[in-house]
């Protein structure tokens, strides 16, 4: 593997943050990016080896070398290159499968909120589409959607934690550190989020405001409108505000007042 050379521009690799007061984390970066000093990258041409290295570098074994070799707040390329790598062919497939699963779980979590470029719809809305029988009872309550989302978050959290502990166990055995390290992962070190009522309801309000102004549509994945040509076919269930202004008044002055349209007594 190599890093920094222009021959590796736009190729997939492993990226990490150079400066941090917390634990280092290595992530897969898809094709199309260029490394920089603030976000160095490792480029590995073989996908299986890339996944294997991602599993190793995020394990408790590599964390031991981080503490030994990275003695400042910087995680520099030269220090990472000094990490001893034992490539165990017998465990290659198992490690790759676990790491691939972790990548999927982590991306599912990240894509659940508007900060992701691949955000589609709010998870509360997705809960309705996943369980269409909810529509049969007529009213759909926010509490039910949140409960479904909370269950999915907990399942994802526990699965990722189990996978990380299994990867720790594999690399502890490979490096013969059974007497030095244990595979357990603390909850605070699991990077996917558990459900949080306050945070998740606020994110839903943000999404709802986006729907009111046409940025999103409950039946359309991703951005429904971000400039350009307006496509009314994307809003077949919920129509956004016509003039892009939603008044909120004490009395009923306007027919499109927020309290009249969206808040039932």
Where are these regions (language model features)?
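Hydrophobic alpha-helical scaffolding
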Residues: 2-6, 14, 28, 32, ...
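Unusually extended, aromatic-enriched hydrophobic runs near protein termini
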Residues: 1, 5, 13, 22, ...
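Flexible, glycine/threonine-enriched loop-and-boundary segments that flank and lead into catalytic domains
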Residues: 1-31, 174-176, 183-199
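Low-complexity, flexible helical/coil segments
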Residues: 2-3, 11, 50-55, 76-81, ...
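Basic, amphipathic alpha-helical recognition segments used for DNA target recognition
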Residues: 7-10, 17-82, 96-101, 105
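Non-catalytic DNA-recognition/assembly elements of restriction-modification systems
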Residues: 84-260, 264
